[in-house]
Design a protein with these regions (language model features):
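GT-A fold catalytic core of metal-dependent nucleotide-sugar glycosyltransferases
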Residues: 26-92, 109-113
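A recurrent flexible, glycine/aromatic-enriched loop bordering the glycosyltransferase active site
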Residues: 95-109, 137
């Protein structure tokens, strides 16, 4: 998947940077930054990698594909730009997850270099107050995004354009700039190259 993401970024005229751990194979022709973080929660490790790398740019999940040049986004005035979920997601217990996590962490555009470290700090501070290990929660990044982004100059981008979920082959993705192949969608990613 990371290779397909990198290829899609190159097709738009940009050079991707691959952030990964010390074990994962690099991507040929791609600048790679390795981080020695351990632990099982990939979301927490990703937050730590982003905060340590901490450069202005667009951070994408590896199961995404860029369809159009994203330079116009970086031309906007913001500290952070996030994709806002446009539909309600209710869990089996009836909890409105969209209210708790209005942004998808798969797409994060950053100009303010204090933002990514502030996300990590927020998780640590919150877990110390609540006496719970938030680093073990799969959605710790998305819960944190809403809290920390609310204190910044935030641009909300439509998820249907900049973080469109693709689950099957042949979907109409003509208006989408970035595709996201979540869960079983990963199985069809190659058909969108």
């Amino acid at each position: 998947m990371p290779r397909m993401l990198a290829e899609s970024i190159r097709k738009t005229g940009h050079n991707p940077v691959f952030l990964t751990d010390n074990k994962t194979e690099g991507i040929e022709g791609c600048e790679t930054y390795r981080f020695g973080f351990t632990g099982e929660n990939v979301v927490w490790k990703r937050m730590l990698c982003y905060a340590e790398y901490n450069q202005e740019g667009i951070y994408l999940d590896s199961d995404m594909m860029v369809m159009k040049n994203l330079e116009p986004i970086m031309a906007l005035d913001f500290d952070v730009a996030l994709t806002k979920v446009s539909h309600q997601i209710i869990d089996p217990k009836g909890v409105n997850l969209t209210a708790l996590m209005p942004y998808n962490g798969g797409f994060i555009a950053v100009k303010d270099k204090t933002f990514l470290p502030a996300m990590v700090r927020h998780v640590i501070d919150t877990q110390n107050e609540a006496d719970v290990d938030l680093t073990q929660y799969w959605y710790c990044d998305q819960m944190t995004l809403a809290e920390v982004a609310g204190t910044r100059n935030l641009v909300e981008l439509p998820v249907k354009i900049y973080n469109k979920t693709v689950k099957k082959p042949g979907m109409d993705v003509s208006g989408a700039w970035v595709l996201h192949f979540k869960g079983r969608g990963k199985e069809v990613m190659e058909s969108y190259q």
